[in-house]
Each structure stands twice: as structure tokens, then as C-alpha cells.
Amino acid sequence: MNTTKEIIDDLKEGKMVIIVDDEDRENEGDLVCAADKVGSDIINFMAKHGRGLICLTLTKKKCSVLGLKQMTDSNESNNKTAFTVSIEAKEGITTGISAQDRATTILAAVNPDATKKSIAQPGPVSYTHLTLPTKRIV
């Protein structure tokens, strides 16, 4: 186990970490990296070894700026995961599904100057807005 400071330092250096959920939620580990440091190598690693959805966590404010709406008005999933409609970058991609295209989409979304005009909906990468843990762990 690492300290919170060590994890934050690793993320700032562009490294991936594994964050484990609470036992009362999904009780799983998630591969996590700083979105502004993502590249095709990280996307490839996540797709090959994580074998799940590659998602980007955004604040509610950022979702609003990008015009991201919830995938459904009535969230009936067990964990109430707040997925939005998926997106892709409007520029700099081809099919949108390659590791490079997904990294480009993530970088476009987290760009401080990004607007609704920066992205297209739907796209191949899933997004979710920021949700706070129900129990503080740090």
C-alpha cells in the first residue's frame, strides 16, 4: 500500500496506479492515471490488462461546459454510476476507437479551453461525472 502523497506524486509523474473500491461498492481495482498525461501506451495497457471500460472522470462543471448529458434520466444501475453519453474529439482522430484516438479524445476533453465544439457525441469512450465517496478513506 502507498500513502496518498505517494499516489499523487506518481500520478503527477504520469504513472498509473491501482485504486481499490470499498468492499460495499464494486470491490474492484481500477487502473487510474492523470488524464492530462494520457497517451496511447496507457490506453493500450488499460485495454489489454484492465479489460473493462476506459472512462474519464470529469467534474459536473466540466460536463456542463462540454454539454455532456446523463446517459439516462432514470439511473437504475445497482451502483448508480453516473455515465454520460460517450464522446470523441472532433479533430485529430480517425475512427475514434484506436488507442491514439481515445487518448486524443481524453486530452481534448480535459483541455482547459475545451467547449461543446471540441467534442462529438456519441463516441467510443465512456465518461462519468465526479461522484464523491460515501465514506472518506484518506
Task: Report each predicted region and the residues it spans.
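N-terminal, positively charged regions that mediate nucleic acid binding
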Residues: M1-E28, V32-G39
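A generic local secondary-structure boundary/capping motif
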Residues: E6-I8, I43-M46, Q70-E76, T95-G96, ...
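Generic secondary-structure signature for well-ordered alpha-helical cores
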Residues: D9-M16, K48-R51, K90
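Short, acidic Gly/Pro/Ser/Thr-rich loop/turn segments
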Residues: E26, C63, G92-T94
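A phosphate-binding glycine/aspartate-rich beta-alpha loop in the early core of alpha/beta enzymes
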Residues: E28-I87
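Hydrophobic alpha-helical hairpins/lids featuring a short glycine-rich hinge
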Residues: E76-Y127
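Conserved small/polar residues in nucleotide/adenosyl-binding loops
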Residues: Y127-T134
